[in-house]
């Protein structure tokens, strides 16, 4: 090397330049003269890096760094830069190990304590050294391109991430940039990483090992070539190592990479501006045991290469072991499922063997879903039934089954069991003769098939349509539950006797006999409540209670009369007592008569089918009293004491509701008119004698307070109260 070149190298080292290269000073000056824009870009980049040195604290801000400080400042064509980033992240996002390798490249050490999974486990790792201690990712790519031009062997060991797009310019449409920006954002924020295949892991291992070997070879070659001075060893050895300092297996390292077409030099040579100020480019620390590396550390401080040997990758043997364990677990689960299926099949075969074929199967009574045919099999049975009917007309049709009991009416209530069930009896001798084999009650079943008038089969109309014969040879059909679509329609129910198959399959059914069709109609009850004589006993209990109330009224009247001796004269008290006794006697007579009338009326309308929702709850329209209104006496007896203290008389019914005089009278009229207008309607419970206690107390108070007036308005005694909420016992069969 010439003296001028050595002086230049010494001058560069004295100026604290940590990125030495093997170019001479003239080349550096040419680079500075030819690429002033690149120098300015690098100056701006380093200034921006210093500004955001303390702002980047987590992995999520990597997107902003890549877009703002790498793409815009160091790549002249923004569209090309986005294409590179997009392809690069599409490659590394498929492999967790590649993501960890990338973190190591940019200065992020993966957390060895955490378990490596298929997710981005290190999303909160610090990347503060990404900008402050490292140059841009494209600088590394540029160096790799220079190295690959000289070393073609290294290009076969790295992954191929070429960009096939042509060289672009600054006039790229904005929407293209935004679309690519969104793609990069998705790749950066996408945490559901795919599981790494074996091939990618093997390629990563080979690439990393080959890169490390090439690094060592290049370093040794450089050390053997240069023995002139320490400066030459440091400068040239450092440059050779810097060429291979970024063995990024995810970037394109072949000669056809479009990075050469990008404007602006991204190499690591020192860029000298107009003021001859040297701009340093920072790199992260690395671990290298080579002599030249240690000498460079003593001289250059922070400048280092990146060694990927500390990255722990799962070995191929471990991966094979994990796959084998998973396969063994799957095989074990499959074997368990096969064993369960075999056990179930063995149990079914044992049950069939215990049955021993037709005539030897166990007796089944009641509804059994296991003997019921499927809808498809039911269609086959119906076809066989039609063939049987065509061959055997009704006049000459032999029959081994007989319907010995059927409902009293053809009405089938909605969601109700039949009031009287169908009972079908089988004649085993006739059935055995028809089937040509000895049959028992357990080997014959009966099926109820519902069809419409046109003979169309209604599969979904009957819930339980298959019954087995009991020991007496009877099959009981009581659970005929009809669906909603059958309400209000008339259907035909036909019973057929079928030989019960051993394998519970009706693909080839043997029909023994077919009964005559029975008409059924599905209706809905307006009032499904069934009334009985307990309602009359309820009225009787009310009358007994009313008589007890009358006796209590007499005692209360006597007590009230005794308490008023201080205010009235003895003669007046005696007269009041006589009047009260007479009132009580009249009340008792009327109460008894009213109770008997109520019993007669309620007993006559006991079987009414109207619902209780039609009871009147409002008073009739005001106006003239109709001619059909009942002649009702609002006073029970002629008393001579008008009211003085009470302004309105109230009446309390048995349900605790209080009515005034006018409202009570209106309710009574409405009840009587409703009964006459609708004789078949819901019987309104006219319960008397429940209000005598309060009414008689009011009457006695009125009689004792004012003894001069003989008006009978104060002694109005209502013996009838309308019970609007009467509890009715509900029984269903």
Swiss-Prot record:
Comp. bias regions, Low complexity: 13-51, 148-167, 286-300, 542-616, 633-654, 689-712
Ranges of biased composition (kind: Acidic residues): 231-245
Superkingdom in the source lineage: Eukaryota
Region of interest: Disordered: 1-52, 145-174, 219-303, 347-374, 542-658, 676-733
Polar residues bias (residue ranges): 1-12, 246-258, 362-372, 713-733
Entry protein name: Uncharacterized protein DDB_G0271850
Organism field: Dictyostelium discoideum
């Amino acid at each position: 090397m010439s003296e001028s070149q050595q002086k230049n190298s010494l001058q560069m080292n004295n100026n604290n330049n940590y990125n030495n290269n093997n170019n001479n000073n003239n080349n550096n000056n040419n680079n500075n003269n030819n690429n002033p824009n690149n120098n300015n870009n690098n100056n701006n980049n380093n200034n921006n890096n210093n500004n955001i040195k303390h702002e980047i604290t987590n992995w999520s801000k990597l997107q902003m760094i890549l877009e703002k400080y790498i793409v815009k400042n160091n790549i002249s064509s923004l569209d090309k830069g986005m294409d590179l980033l997009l392809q690069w992240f599409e490659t590394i996002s498929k492999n967790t190990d590649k993501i960890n390798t990338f973190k190591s490249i940019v200065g992020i050490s993966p957390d060895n304590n955490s378990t490596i999974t298929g997710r981005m486990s290190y999303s909160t790792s610090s990347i503060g050294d990404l900008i402050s201690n490292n140059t841009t990712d494209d600088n590394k790519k540029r160096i790799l391109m220079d190295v690959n031009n000289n070393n073609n062997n290294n290009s076969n060991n790295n992954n191929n991430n070429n960009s096939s797009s042509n060289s672009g310019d600054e006039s790229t449409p904005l929407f293209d940039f935004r679309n690519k920006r969104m793609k990069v954002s998705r790749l950066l924020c996408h945490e559901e990483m795919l599981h790494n295949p074996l091939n990618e892991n093997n390629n990563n291992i080979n690439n990393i090992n080959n890169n490390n070997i090439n690094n060592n070879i290049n370093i040794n070659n450089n050390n053997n070539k240069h023995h002139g001075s320490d400066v030459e060893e440091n400068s040239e050895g450092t440059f050779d190592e810097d060429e291979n300092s970024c063995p990024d297996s995810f970037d394109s390292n072949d000669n056809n990479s479009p990075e050469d077409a990008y404007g602006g030099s991204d190499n690591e040579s020192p860029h000298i501006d107009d003021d001859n100020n040297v701009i340093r480019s920072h790199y992260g620390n690395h671990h290298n045991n080579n002599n030249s590396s240690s000498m460079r550390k003593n001289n250059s401080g922070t400048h280092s290469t990146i060694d990927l040997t500390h990255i722990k990758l799962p070995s191929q043997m471990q991966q094979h072991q994990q796959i084998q364990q998973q396969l063994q677990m799957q095989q074990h689960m499959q074997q368990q499922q096969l064993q369960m299926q075999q056990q179930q099949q063995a149990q079914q075969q044992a049950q069939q063997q215990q049955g021993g074929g037709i005539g030897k199967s166990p007796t089944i009574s009641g509804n059994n879903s296991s003997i019921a045919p499927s809808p498809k099999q039911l269609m086959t049975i119906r076809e066989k039934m039609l063939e049987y009917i065509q061959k055997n007309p009704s006049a000459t049709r032999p029959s081994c089954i007989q319907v010995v009991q059927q409902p009293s009416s053809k009405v089938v209530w909605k969601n109700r069991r039949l009031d009287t069930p169908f009972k079908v009896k089988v004649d085993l001798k006739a059935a055995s003769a028809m089937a040509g084999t000895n049959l028992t009650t357990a080997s014959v079943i009966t099926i109820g098939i519902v069809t419409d008038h046109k003979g169309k089969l209604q599969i979904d109309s009957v819930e339980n349509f298959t019954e087995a014969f009991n020991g007496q040879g009877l099959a009981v059909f009581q659970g005929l539950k009809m669906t909603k679509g059958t309400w209000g329609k008339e259907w035909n129910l036909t019973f057929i006797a079928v030989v019960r198959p051993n394998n519970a399959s009706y693909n080839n059914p043997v029909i023994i006999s077919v009964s005559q069709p029975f008409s059924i109609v599905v209706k809905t009850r307006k009032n499904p409540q069934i009334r009985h004589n307990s309602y009359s006993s309820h009225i009787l209990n009310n009358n007994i209670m009313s008589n007890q109330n009358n006796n209590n009224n007499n005692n209360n009247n006597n007590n009230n009369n005794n308490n008023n001796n201080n205010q009235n004269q003895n003669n007046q008290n005696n007269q009041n007592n006589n009047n009260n006794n007479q009132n009580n006697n009249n009340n008792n007579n009327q109460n008894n008569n009213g109770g008997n009338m109520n019993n007669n009326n309620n007993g006559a309308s006991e079987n009414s089918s109207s619902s209780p929702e039609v009871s009147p709850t409002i008073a009739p329209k005001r106006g003239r009293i109709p001619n059909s209104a009942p002649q009702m006496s609002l006073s029970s007896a002629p008393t001579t004491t008008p009211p003085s203290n009470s302004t309105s008389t109230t009446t309390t019914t048995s349900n605790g509701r209080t009515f005034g005089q006018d409202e009570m009278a209106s309710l009574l009229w409405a009840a009587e008119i409703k009964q006459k207008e609708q004789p078949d309607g819901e019987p309104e419970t006219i319960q008397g004698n429940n209000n005598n206690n309060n009414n008689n107390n009011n009457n006695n108070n009125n009689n004792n307070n004012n003894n001069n007036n003989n008006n009978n308005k104060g002694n109005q005694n209502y013996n009838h109260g309308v019970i609007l909420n009467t509890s009715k016992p509900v029984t269903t069969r």
